[in-house]
Amino acid sequence: MTQNDFRKEKDSLGELNVPASALYGVQTQRAVDNFPISGLHPWRAFVWSIAAVKRAAALVNFELGLFNDREVDGKHFTAKQLAESIAQAAEEVMDGKWNDQFVVDPFQAGAGTSHNMNANEVIAHLAAAAGGEHDPVLRLIGGTAGERRLHLAPDGLAVVGVEQGVEIRV
């Protein structure tokens, strides 16, 4: 790959090169670089479940009035636009259109924080595609209000279990 095949993105830890065609961002790239364990990508059912949780959180939180109209970087987002764009983007992920954008190793350490950021970055990028920038939406979804990053992996796995017809005991 040449330098033109990358874009520079910055977070609180510094700047990294991210593939120019990637829908994910710097935090996902950092996880890929830091956790090169198996070389595998997350399983399709897990990606589907993460997107299902993100979609549900966006729609329910809109209904509960937890999303507000926001002005970010000169762009106006109504609460309804925000919720609908996140839900639509999550549906595209659920349909399997963007499986190649989920690149965090399934065996990475932790409670799923890197998988959560991978999902947030991809969904935010898709949700804001018409505007050309994903940063404003990413800052607005911030965990999709009420859906915590440490709960995403267990919630997602529970959704997979239900979807696959597995009995879940608590």
Task: Give the ranges of each region predicted by the language model.
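Conserved, well-structured ligand/cofactor-binding cores
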Residues: M1-R149
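N-terminal low-complexity segments that are often proline-rich with Ser/Thr-Pro
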Residues: H134-V170
